[in-house]
Each structure stands twice: as structure tokens, then as C-alpha cells.
């Protein structure tokens, strides 16, 4: 059975996180797509592959997604990116990270590259970034 934890973020807000094999030096961070969560086929497949290879796995549900706090309608790329940044700082600051992002998750993963030097790899699945800024 998969055990999730909730990490307190800001005042009375919690982000749902799945964290496996905490002793690993390398972590796959899965970032799901818009209106998705961590119960789908992609995160479950990746988690199994990580376990098989003794690599850490982490996924999170951004605000308004899955069982995390908030309403989807109030979320923005910035707020969801900040959710990801906060959790990486809490859990993986001294670990090597490979980000695998699906759709919106790929966009959020690309944004993290400017914040973390310990990201050693990136895979975008159906990436949907917007480069107008």
C-alpha cells in the first residue's frame, strides 16, 4: 500500500507528498499534469521502477490537485511552481534529482532548473510550457 504524507505549507495549507526510499542519493521527482494527481499509471509505474533500481521516488500534488489544500481555480503556474520548490527544499536539498514531468508537470519542472543546482536530469512527457515571459 502506498503511504502519503501531508507537509504543512504556509498557514493551514498542506501538500500531499509521496516519498519512497529516503536513504537514496538519487531521486526521481514526478510532477503530474493539470487536474491530475499521484494515483495514475505514470506515477505508479515510475515508483515501481525506482524501487526495482533502488532509486528514491518523490511525487507531490500541487494545491487544488488530488488531496492537497486549496481550490484548483485559484491556482497559477507560479503558485504550483512554488509548491514544488518548497517540497524539494524540504525533502531533497542534498540529493541528486531527476525530474520527470507530465504536461503541466514538465513546465513546472523546467522552472525548477533555475532554483536547484542538484537537478541532474529532466524528462518532459507531453511537455506544455509557455515561453511568453
Please place each PLM-identified region on the residue numbering.
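N-terminal cap/lid segment of alpha/beta-hydrolase-fold proteins
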Residues: 1-23
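Short beta-strand element of the alpha/beta-hydrolase
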Residues: 25-33
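The serine-hydrolase catalytic nucleophile loop
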Residues: 35-47
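Active-site loop signature of alpha/beta-hydrolase-fold enzymes
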Residues: 36-37, 63-68, 130
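Conserved alpha/beta-hydrolase
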Residues: 47-69
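Catalytic nucleophile-loop/oxyanion-hole region of alpha/beta-hydrolase
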Residues: 65-91
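Primarily recognizes the serine-hydrolase "nucleophile elbow" in alpha/beta-hydrolase
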Residues: 90, 95-133
